[in-house]
Curated annotation (Swiss-Prot):
Keywords: Ribonucleoprotein, Ribosomal protein, RNA-binding, rRNA-binding. Forms part of the ribosomal stalk, playing a central role in the interaction of the ribosome with GTP-bound translation factors. Part of the ribosomal stalk of the 50S ribosomal subunit. The N-terminus interacts with L11 and the large rRNA to form the base of the stalk. The C-terminus forms an elongated spine to which L12 dimers bind in a sequential fashion forming a multimeric L10(L12)X complex. This is Large ribosomal subunit protein uL10. It comes from Borrelia hermsii (strain HS1 / DAH). GO terms for biological process: translation. The gene is rplJ. GO terms for molecular function: large ribosomal subunit rRNA binding; structural constituent of ribosome. The lineage of its organism: Bacteria, Pseudomonadati, Spirochaetota, Spirochaetia, Spirochaetales. SUPFAM superfamilies: Ribosomal protein L10-like (SSF160369). It comes from the Bacteria. The keyword Mitochondrion does not apply. Pfam families: Ribosomal_L10. PANTHER family: 39S RIBOSOMAL PROTEIN L10, MITOCHONDRIAL.
């Protein structure tokens, strides 16, 4: 006996597979209680940072993850699930939904960041990291400080020599 696979489910599977193609950072959110307007607001904020948000069917998502050899994520696929993906600067995307959590019923379930499973606590810590731009700025200020100090010292030295 051969079971016929629902073409709509095959289409959803392929769509989700395409959605995850080339994405190393995947977050799972529980959107229970969010209005359509709030979910749309979150989606827009995520898209402004080059991320994507999609509401998924858990069983199909489990199959896609299995197909991609991504293990240990089934526990995040319970209840209403929205999946957020990010190509780079994943912590920027994580900051967005953690800010959103403060003012809504949104809950963070967990994620998959650069090949590693992150639980909610680890994702929260990850969201606190500086962005790439902030890290570069911080690094540049650290490099610049000794040079600024040297310049001020030389200026003070030249001022002293001019006075004498």
């Amino acid at each position: 006996m051969h079971t016929k696979i629902n073409p709509k489910k095959v289409e959803m599977f392929n769509s989700l597979k395409e959605f995850l193609d080339g994405k190393d950072n995947i977050f799972f959110l529980d959107y229970r209680g969010l209005t359509v307007a709030k979910l749309t607001e979150l989606r827009n904020k995520v898209e402004n940072e080059k991320g994507e948000l999609k509401v998924v069917k858990n069983n199909i998502m489990k199959r896609v993850l299995k197909d991609r050899h991504m293990e240990g994520l089934d526990s995040y696929l319970l209840g209403p699930t929205a999946v957020v993906t990010a190509v780079d600067e994943a912590n920027v995307i994580a900051k967005i939904f953690y800010e959103f959590v403060k003012t809504s019923t949104l809950k963070v379930k967990g994620g998959f960041v650069l090949g590693e499973v992150y639980d909610e606590a680890k994702l929260n810590a990850y969201s606190q990291l500086p962005t790439k731009k902030e890290a570069i700025s911080l690094f540049m200020s650290v490099l610049k400080a000794p040079m600024s100090k040297l310049a001020r010292t030389l200026k003070a030295l030249s001022d002293v020599k001019v006075e004498s």
